[in-house]
Regions:
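ATP/pyrophosphate-binding catalytic subdomain of soluble kinases
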Residues: 749, 753, 788-791
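Conserved cytosolic headpiece of P-type ATPases
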Residues: 1-726, 733-734, 747, 762, ...
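A C-terminal functional module that forms or caps the active site or interfaces directly
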Residues: 797
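Long hydrophobic segments that form regular secondary structure
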Residues: 757-758, 763-764, 774
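Membrane-water interface at loop-to-transmembrane-helix junctions
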Residues: 728-747, 773-781
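Generic alpha-helical transmembrane segments
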Residues: 704, 779-794
Length: 877
């Protein structure tokens, strides 16, 4: 049986039951039901049981299970109940279940975000061009391809206008393949030589074309090669990696302390019986449990997941978690002008030259389509098609009179495109592009129906008209023509774009987005440098830059040609002088980004075209455009703007700062709590009594502390979030005095807890004495006081330096978490069955009052230290 590449386009269309105008919506729906979505099969997701077992392999839970095993042996030998063992195992199981639930939620959130950035393609349905998700493609669909598009499925080419496709993912060959429509001979033509086919997994890098889908999903060549698409593990952020390293360091440190305490206790006991060894080992296990912040990883993951979801609701879709942290460090934002700083709603407001000829040239040398409700396509091209329609020149009518039969597609290097059309008298070429580039290739101009030589005087006059439009912040394009008796054999740009006849200029306005000016001001207040990059004329760029507040003077703008005259060393010295770059090409963007990065600045870069991919990859944060962006740029971007709006980047930066601040608050809270537990167990052991058992510490770590820590992750941004400079990306977890804060707060809670233990013991015996061994009343008081102390301390953590009583907003979730944790603590103490299981004694109102008074001390003491720190910071300035 002949392959698709051995048959003509018409034969392939007939076999697929399709036609050049595509399928109807009804046919497509019927085929979708039959063939299924155009997707590659994913690896099977692990079952709930597999996920649960994976959770149980966590080192922290293994330590807890070891503690349960030791406790079981101790209780069996001493004849005590296994209540403590049961409680530890319940905590382990609960933690594993919560881990599975959270993992499932995070996976669902990521899948939802992936849906938001799902690949789309242009397809003909019912004879009209529509944009659909690539997964909805079926055999027989006719797709339209242009530079920057990812080929959505395997297809036979119907048209190719200088189209080149990069097929490295399939063939390993990085050089793009020039595509053609003609048939191929031979039964087994190698995939890389099938020039009339296009394949899923490849990318259009130049030109445009049209293809009929022959194989979707797993029937594609990519599907045959891949078989099953392996799922990649979710990458960890730098913060998560630092926390993992911190966990390993803490584990080693605690192991050393445990060994010391184990030996110390045995030496003090003076006997080496099994019972003594086991009880001493349990003290060491208590210390290990106290030191491990069991809820920390979960809290960080949850806060990141919630933050990423919130950002997506604000039109910033995070594709890589690392971007969340990097956003908070951003120092420079390099942004395209069109569509990002402006509304991307182009309208022709001025023109020069013969109107009818200019409108015809602009409409035909154009890939936008005219539909009932206006033009569809790239906004600039759509504006030109609408301009022609307003003159009574509808594009479909023009195309029927002058059908396209050749072209040199747009290229950002040439800054123009050309198309060739058949006429009654031969062939005509229309060229449109940047005025200076088009004019440079012209030798004549048309006026009043005559073709006249292009003198220097006329050339100067045209450039003056261009400058006058550019000074009004208009985007200006020029049109030219060239006549042929016969269709040119060679249709390369260098062959077509010479000896042109100048027609005229069209000036378009793209209004500035109303919210961008305020966003630029917010950037400056936050210590972020906004930089505008555009292909427009320098005068246009300067006018818009001034209006937005990006620059104050034309000397702060530079052109791409001027950049070409600078070495990298010279650019490094000059890069801080410029905030507006005009007439730039994609390679200039890479140089600009790299110059800023060599300065040590964390840089974000936006882009939409296929040629922007290198600069987006070079930046610390690559930002793709969700509306106008190509699949290539979206795939390499760290973040995609679903509204193509500069203000969204600023919002994302603010959210990134807030998320990082909140994670630090949660870390400080949890580590200060763990510090107090470690110090408490350690010093209590040295003093000769048991402060708390492992099960008590587990309850505090997993129940009492986790809910407030999660609530801190939802804290609103502080008033100075966007008025302080970006943080240094090299800063560690404990930067900004966090390490000192954790230490002194841990010591404070330790002193309060041990004091409470001693008071509880003295109230039990009726006189003052230092406790020895185990005091049930002392342990109960220590548990109650430490729990309340850490609950109150979570309120302190709403701000690292500011007084919590000065914050303008309220964290209702934190209030709920504090009340909930307090209620659960009370439940453990007051419900007899649970209290007995934990080894607690009944608590009197007096003891409640003492514990409450002691725990409350954490608020004024921390507030006082914050006040001293604020005054010290002011003096330092």
């Amino acid at each position: 049986m002949e392959k698709e590449y051995n048959r003509s386009p018409q034969e392939v269309l007939e076999e697929l039951g399709s036609c050049p105008t595509g399928l109807t919506a009804a046919e497509a729906a019927e085929r979708l039901a039959k063939h299924g979505p155009n997707k590659l099969k994913e690896a099977e997701k692990p079952s709930l049981l597999q996920r649960f077992l994976t959770q149980l392999k966590d080192p922290m839970l293994l330590i807890l299970m070891a503690a349960a095993a030791v406790s079981a042996v101790t209780n069996a030998l001493s004849g005590e109940s296994f209540t403590e063992v049961f409680i530890i195992l319940v905590v382990v199981l609960l933690n594993a279940v919560l881990g599975v639930v959270q993992e499932s939620k995070a996976e669902a959130a990521i899948e939802a975000l992936q849906t938001m950035t799902a690949a789309k393609c242009k397809v003909l349905r019912d004879g009209h061009q529509v944009v659909i998700e690539s997964s909805q493609l079926v055999p027989g669909d006719v797709v339209l391809l242009e530079a920057g598009d990812a080929v959505p499925a395997d297809g036979r080419l119907l048209e190719s206008a200088s189209m080149k496709i990069e097929e490295a993912a399939l063939t390993g060959e990085s050089v793009p393949v020039t595509k053609a429509v003609g048939l191929l001979t031979g039964d087994n033509v190698p995939l890389g030589d099938r020039k009339n086919m296009c394949y899923m997994g490849s990318t259009v890098v130049y030109g445009r074309g049209k293809a009929v889908i022959t194989a979707p999903g797993m029937d594609t060549e990519m599907g045959k090669i891949a078989g099953v698409l392996a799922q990649t593990e979710q990458e960890q952020t730098p913060l998560q990696r630092k926390l993992n390293e911190l966990g390993k360091t803490m584990s080693k440190l605690v192991l050393g302390i445990c060994v010391f305490i184990f030996i110390f206790d045995l030496v003090v006991a003076g006997e080496f019986t099994l019972d003594t060894v086991l009880s001493t080992f349990m003290v060491a296990v208590s210390l290990a449990v106290a030191a491990i912040p069991e809820g920390l990883a979960t809290v960080v993951t949850v806060v990141l997941s919630i933050g990423v979801t919130n950002m997506s609701k604000q039109h910033a879709v995070i594709r890589r978690l690392t971007a969340v942290e990097t956003l908070g460090c951003t120092q420079v934002i390099c942004s395209d002008k069109t569509g990002t700083l402006t509304q991307n709603k182009m309208t022709v407001v001025e023109h020069t030259g013969p109107t009818e000829l200019l409108a015809t040239a602009m409409a035909l040398c154009n890939d936008a389509a005219l539909e009932e409700n206006g033009a569809i396509g790239e906004p600039t091209e759509a504006a030109l098609v609408n301009f022609a329609a307003a003159q009574g020149l509808k594009k479909p009518v023009l195309e029927s009179r002058q059908p396209r039969c050749g072209e040199a597609p747009f290229d950002s290097g040439r800054k123009m495109m050309s198309t060739i059309h058949r006429t009654d008298n031969g062939f005509i070429q229309y060229t449109k592009g940047a005025p200076d580039e088009v004019l440079r290739r012209c030798t004549s101009y048309t006026e009043s129906g005559q073709i006249l030589p292009l003198t220097e005087e006329k050339r100067t006059a045209i450039l003056a008209e261009n400058k006058a439009m550019a000074d009004k912040a208009l985007r200006v394009l020029a049109a030219a023509e060239r006549l042929y008796d016969a269709l040119p054999d060679r249709q390369e740009p260098e062959d077509l774009e010479q000896d042109l006849c100048f027609i005229g200029l069209a000036g378009m306005i793209d209004p500035i987005r109303p919210e961008v000016k305020a966003a630029v001001a917010e950037c400056r207040a936050a210590g972020i440098r906004p930089v505008m990059i555009t292909g427009d004329h320098k005068d246009t760029a300067v006018a818009i830059g001034k209006e937005l507040g990006i620059i104050t003077d034309a000397s702060q703008a530079v052109t791409g040609s001027a950049l070409d005259g600078l070495t990298d060393e010279e650019l490094d010295k000059a890069v801080e002088k410029y905030s507006v770059y005009a007439r730039v090409q994609p390679e200039h963007k890479v140089r600009i980004v790299n110059a800023w990065r060599r300065k040590g600045a964390i840089t974000a870069m936006t882009g939409d075209g296929v040629n922007d991919a290198p600069s987006i990859k070079s930046a610390d944060i690559g930002v793709g455009m969700g509306i106008t962006g190509t699949d290539v740029t979206k795939n390499v971007a760290d973040m995609v703007l679903s509204d193509d709006n500069f203000a969204t980047i600023v919002t994302a930066v603010e959210e990134g700062r807030r998320i990082y601040d909140n994670i630090r608050k949660a870390i400080q809270f949890l580590l200060a709590s763990n510090m107090s537990e470690v110090l408490g167990v350690f010093f209590a052991t040295l003093l000769g009594f048991t402060l708390l058992n492992p099960v008590h510490l587990l309850f505090i770590n997993l129940i009492t502390d986790c809910f407030p820590a999660l609530a801190l992750g939802l804290e609103k941004g502080e008033p100075d979030t966007m008025t302080r400079p970006p943080r240094d990306s090299k800063d560690g977890i404990f930067a900004g005095g966090l390490g000192f804060d954790i230490l002194y707060q841990g010591v404070l809670i330790t002193i309060i807890t041990i004091t409470s233990y001693i008071i509880g013991h003295c109230m039990e015996v009726g006189y003052f004495e230092m406790p020895k061994g185990v005091s049930d009343d002392g342990m109960t008081m220590a548990f109650l006081t430490m729990s309340m102390c850490e609950i109150f301390h979570s309120f302190n953590m709403r701000s690292q330096r500011k007084s919590v009583f000065s914050l303008p907003s309220h964290n209702k979730v934190l209030w709920g978490a504090m009340i909930g944790s307090l209620a659960l603590t009370t439940l453990v103490l007051e419900v007899p069955v649970i209290a007995n299981a934990f080894g607690f004694t009944p608590v009197s109102w007096t003891e409640y009052g003492v514990a409450l008074a002691l725990a409350f001390l954490v608020l004024p003491v921390v507030e006082l230290v914050k006040l001293i720190q604020r005054r010290a910071a002011r003096r330092a300035k």
